Amino acid sequence: MGAIVAIMLYAAACGRSNSSESPTAIQYPEPRYPSYLKPPTSIDEVLPHVRPLVRNKTGFQGGGLGVAQPGETVTFVLGPEAEDLIVGAVKRAMEERGVHVNLVNEYEMVGVSRADALEYRNIRRSYTSEQGYMEAATWVEANFPRPDPVKAWLRERRPDLADKLFPKNRELSPRLREVQEKLLWPNLGKGIQAYLKQHPEVRGVFWGKGGGTFLRRNLHPMEDRFLGLFVVDNRWDVMSMLGTYPGDVWQLVEDQTMEPLIHVDKMTVTDPEGTNVWADFNEEQARNWARGVYQRGHLYMFPNQATGRFGYSVVEYPAFQKEWLPREPLAVIHGTLAGTVNHTGFFPRWEIHFTDNGYVGEVKGGGVVGEALREYMQLPHINDLAYPFHNETHKGYWYLYEIAFGTHPKAFRNFTGLDEGTAIPERLRSGVIHWGLGITLHHDPGVQTQSQKLLDFTAEYNLPRDHGFHTHTYFSTYRVHLRNADRWVTLIDRGRLTSLDNAEVRALASRYGNPDQLLAEDWRPEIPGINAPGNYDTDYAPDPWRTVKLVIDKVLAGTYEHFYPPAAAAPRSTGH
């Protein structure tokens, strides 16, 4: 695991009484940032990095680029942040091995002009990850069948809060509202299907940077032509080890993590930022959880996310299994969730307290996003109706839906993403847990398409169709209790995915080089009072962005103290 920094946590533990961590000297892994992420300036400079990438058949939430065979034609569906230099290099490397590649922008798939797409993007991406509270705005705009009444409800109650979440400079003209509608996943899916029908020579598409389940579903009945995500489209990711990591090592790490779940009757999670939660499971819950846990790079480590759907096949991934997994009996969480980061960015520390029934009972702190959550907890019908496939004893929306593990040791905090208002890439790193509140259902029984019962229910009552209000935790300890063995197993230890240290995993990794290097995390966040000098409660929790920005500036200047592997003594510029 490399060097570990010992930090005295007495002061940091003050005010976080829900943490089970003892206020004594507890060791957490020291900060890191990859030292090898040097900016390329030409396609020739990028090619040595992408040639292994285009042969790798294992990818996040789908296949890697290597699943395309010589003589075939595939299409890269490009998002708005894709960098021409990087995409051009990946295309050339694919064509070197005999695969023809088409490049099509998302906006082209749905008949939107480049000018309109750029205008829409500039208005909607009017914030960075410094404004993590904007996840609350995205939750409304992306998840409600009719967002405008929800915005109006909030403006009537809290006009000050509505102005922060939905400022006038982000309002769309009727023309740009049409653009927005066309660029939503369901319509993009229809556009890509039309494209594939017009181009039968194209085997399939690489599309998107996350949400593989949703992307495949929106391509129905052509989901088999979703080949995988197109993640490595920017200078940060392409110079990383994300796309070239040995797939069999990654798969074995995930297999070892999932193995105990069918035998689990209890789990606990603690984290030095204040999370302390636990849950009990009966045999039916454990069985369904074990069958639905898998998604490559994103393990569903709480039964609620693994159910209400057809689970992924581990052997034939990304194909679905044949068995629909019921949501009930619902898994019930107890305790407190705490953190300072969501999928959009950073915010003052919050605590989410769950009732004995596993429902969100109280939210403390969180700044603007905390205020938003407290308000939206009072939305009409959101607490008094049972969602489809939920028992009447489980009315309401505000349950814990997601505890998901990242599993890739070389994933990292991507600064391009932070510029664009997304902290999503970091959640892929092994041992990082991301948590999500709410309810969604992917499928109805017997049909592997989007749940029509969910769509009908949420349309009738104008309720959210998906989960949201995420929290990222980085130094968690996640333990499960085995029912028949009466033994505890630690799956994450202070942010370290323990399967990375499994003897079988290390033996396999040794075939590719030094297992210590291959299985090491190359990025870890710097958090004062936890793994860096300072006081968590005063130096970090009220304004985490301050620390993050300091790290960004040092990395970009080439002067960061925690480059890993250690950088050359001379400072380097990233050209960012």
Q: Each PLM stretch: what is its role?
A:
Residues G417-A541:
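Internal helix-turn-beta structural module
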Residues V74, N357-G358:
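Glycine-centered positions within short beta-strands or beta-hairpins
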Residues G345-F346, G361-L437, L441-G446, Y512-P525:
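Dual-mode signal for accessory low-complexity, basic/Gly-rich regions
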Residues I352:
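Hard-cation-handling environments
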Residues A11-A13:
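C-terminal motif of bacterial Sec signal peptides marking the signal peptidase cleavage site
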Residues M1-A6:
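Sec-dependent N-terminal signal peptides
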Residues P23-T344, K364, L482, I492-G575:
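Active-site bordering "gate/hinge" segments
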Residues G15-S17:
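Bacterial signal peptide processing site
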